[in-house]
């Protein structure tokens, strides 16, 4: 079985979020179970020089973009046993950053067409399935069925479209149809690409792919509801039978507290005293009062309302009256950045506000904190809570999307669970659950440590999800 994983980003070359992690870790896990999975991404100029200068050039070819033919280069690099292809074009990809340009519609129309053109030149690899990811590659199923269906190398290829975040849909003007995609006016209707007064790449992926998937079971149900459906819920309900919810995992080779070089001390579930040493060292590093007994709550997040920052803002001063330390890492909306800066000034012994993104510090926070706060308004899957579980930082989450699927609320009667959760999007519900966790930490330390061990021993690797993806692939062949 041969899978081509088309994505706009991938670790270790370039990433802005969870899609970049998935684009590497899932193909890696698939290859471990005998599936020939390969990845194709744009060759951005922001990719580190070591990688850019060591790719192997395979072919040069033309890529139709409307009436024009643009240069396309196909390059190859193998990393950690995973084959990667790159589409090279300086005009579209020799820029700072990945997204947010006025011509993003043209850039990713070009990339999508380039992926299909490149298949002819992949020598020993002809995919059975192209797995497309988010709006940047969502138009591939449309182009495949319209422009390539009669070609021998293409007429057997199936497509799966994976929705990582329905909120970002790739909506552009009607002129994109003919000028960039070479598609006729027949596609400009409610049963095709038309979306209000424009066209939606995301809608094309949902309508024209053979199967759909998204990144958790709960999110697959949520996006069929108008509250989460971003005006595509009706379309998703109509394809409900074809929609699979498969929770993401994390790469246990990389995210491993036993070997993580960013930690002060390595540890596992049987050496939790070393986790406590990490807390003490982080307290010293961040100029917080040093105490192994005070519970530390970590937040590693974009500082935006979607991540529940509006809830935190409502009760932050109340929370800082408790016997806790709060360590925050992230950037985002100025109002939330300034909020944390102000309260860090007002409560320097309680709050450390690190308004930056620093991966090494993030790992230290996961390794040192006792609890990890993630009260998202919506969360398709979420990776933070999975890393927190792996590192023994008990998640406190709102029950939405992948948070609901991966964090089992602690039951004080049975002792079951691996974290804490609340249902309603309500600041005082959140505060109540945080204080329940604080009480448990202070008054039942033995049982707290047992809960930490349960969390660390959970399997949130990609191995289970890779098997479910195998079943999804088999269902379309």
Swiss-Prot record:
GO terms for biological process: glycogen biosynthetic process. GO terms for molecular function: alpha-1,4-glucan glucosyltransferase (ADP-glucose donor) activity; alpha-1,4-glucan glucosyltransferase (UDP-glucose donor) activity. Pathway: Glycan biosynthesis; glycogen biosynthesis. It catalyses: [(1->4)-alpha-D-glucosyl](n) + ADP-alpha-D-glucose = [(1->4)-alpha-D-glucosyl](n+1) + ADP + H(+). The gene is glgA. Pfam families: Glyco_transf_5, Glycos_transf_1. Transmembrane segments: none annotated. ADP-alpha-D-glucose binds at residue 15. Keywords: Glycogen biosynthesis, Glycosyltransferase, Transferase. Synthesizes alpha-1,4-glucan chains using ADP-glucose. The keyword Flavoprotein does not apply. This is Glycogen synthase. InterPro entries: Glyco_trans_1 (IPR001296), GS/SS (IPR011835), Starch_synth_cat_dom (IPR013534). PANTHER family: ALPHA AMYLASE DOMAIN-CONTAINING PROTEIN (PTHR45825:SF11), GRANULE-BOUND STARCH SYNTHASE 1, CHLOROPLASTIC/AMYLOPLASTIC (PTHR45825). CDD domains: GT5_Glycogen_synthase_DULL1-like (cd03791). Belongs to the glycosyltransferase 1 family. Bacterial/plant glycogen synthase subfamily. Its EC number is 2.4.1.21.
């Amino acid at each position: 079985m041969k899978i081509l994983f088309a994505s706009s980003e991938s670790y270790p070359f370039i990433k802005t979020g969870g899609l970049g992690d998935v684009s590497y870790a899932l193909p890696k896990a698939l290859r471990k179970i005998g599936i020939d999975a390969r990845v194709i991404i744009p060759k951005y100029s922001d990719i580190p020089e070591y990688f850019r200068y060591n790719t192997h050039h395979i072919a040069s070819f033309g890529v139709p973009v409307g009436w024009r033919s643009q240069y396309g280069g196909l390059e190859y690099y193998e990393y950690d046993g995973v084959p990667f292809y790159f589409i090279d074009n300086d005009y579209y990809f020799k820029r700072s950053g990945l997204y947010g340009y006025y011509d993003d519609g043209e850039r990713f129309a070009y990339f999508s067409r380039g992926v299909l053109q490149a298949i002819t030149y992949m020598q020993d690899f002809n995919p059975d399935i192209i797995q497309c990811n988010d709006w940047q590659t969502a138009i591939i199923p449309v182009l495949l069925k319209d422009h390539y269906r009669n070609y021998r190398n293409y007429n057997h290829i199936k497509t799966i479209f994976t929705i990582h975040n329905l909120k970002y849909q790739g909506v552009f003007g009607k002129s994109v149809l003919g000028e960039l995609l070479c598609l006729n006016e027949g596609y400009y209707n409610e049963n095709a690409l038309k979306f209000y007064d424009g066209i939606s790449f995301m809608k094309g992926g949902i309508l024209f792919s053979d199967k759909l998937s998204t990144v958790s079971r709960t999110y697959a149900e949520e996006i069929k509801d108008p509250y989460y459906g971003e005006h595509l819920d009706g379309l998703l309900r109509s394809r409900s039978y074809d929609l699979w919810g498969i929770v993401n995992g994390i790469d246990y080779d990389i995210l491993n507290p036993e070997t993580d070089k960013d930690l002060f001390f390595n540890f596992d579930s049987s050496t939790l005293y070393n986790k406590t040493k990490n807390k003490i060292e982080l307290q010293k590093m961040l100029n917080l009062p040093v105490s192994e007994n005070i519970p530390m709550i970590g937040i590693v997040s974009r500082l935006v309302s979607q991540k529940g920052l509006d809830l935190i803002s409502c009760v932050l001063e109340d929370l800082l009256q408790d016997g806790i330390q709060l360590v925050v890492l992230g950037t985002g909306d100025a109002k939330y950045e300034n909020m944390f800066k102000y309260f860090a000034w007002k409560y320097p012994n309680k709050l450390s506000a690190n308004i930056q993104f620093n991966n090494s510090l993030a790992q230290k926070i996961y390794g040192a904190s006792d609890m990890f706060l993630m009260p998202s308004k919506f969360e398709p899957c979420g990776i933070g809570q999975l890393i927190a579980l792996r590192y023994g930082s008990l998640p406190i989450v709102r029950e939405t999307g992948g948070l609901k699927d991966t964090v089992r609320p602690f039951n004080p009667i049975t002792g079951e669970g691996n974290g804490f959760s609340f249902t309603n999007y309500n600041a005082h519900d959140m505060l109540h659950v945080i204080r329940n966790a604080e009480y448990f930490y202070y008054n039942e330390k033995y049982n707290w440590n047992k809960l930490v061990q349960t969390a660390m021993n959970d399997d949130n690797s990609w191995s289970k999800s890779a098997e479910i993806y195998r079943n999804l692939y088999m269902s379309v062949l």
